[in-house]
C-alpha cells in the first residue's frame, strides 16, 4: 500500500488537470506560451502518474483495469473481475 500522502497528492494533481484542461487547450491553440507557463505545474497532464485505485501502487499498472498487477491477480483468482478467467492451453 502506498503512502496516503502520495495518493492524496496524485488525486490533487488529477483535479488540477481537470480544472485547467479547457484553459490549457485554449492557450495552446492561441500559442500563448507565456500564459501557459504561469499555470500551476501540477495542472499539466504529463505530471500524472497512473496508480492502482485499490492500493495506490505506481508500478505494474494495468490500464485496462486501472489497478496494479498484484491487485488484479488477487481479484481475478477470486472471480471479482467479470470476463477474466485463468488461461490454460
Swiss-Prot record:
GO terms for cellular component: cytoplasm; small ribosomal subunit. GO terms for molecular function: rRNA binding; structural constituent of ribosome. GO terms for biological process: translation. The keyword Ribosomal protein applies. Transmembrane segments: none annotated. The keyword Oxidoreductase does not apply. It holds the Pfam family Ribosomal_S14. Keywords: Ribonucleoprotein, Ribosomal protein, RNA-binding, rRNA-binding. PANTHER family: 30S RIBOSOMAL PROTEIN S14, SMALL RIBOSOMAL SUBUNIT PROTEIN US14M. Binds 16S rRNA, required for the assembly of 30S particles and may also be responsible for determining the conformation of the 16S rRNA at the A site. Part of the 30S ribosomal subunit. Contacts proteins S3 and S10. Belongs to the universal ribosomal protein uS14 family. This is Small ribosomal subunit protein uS14A.
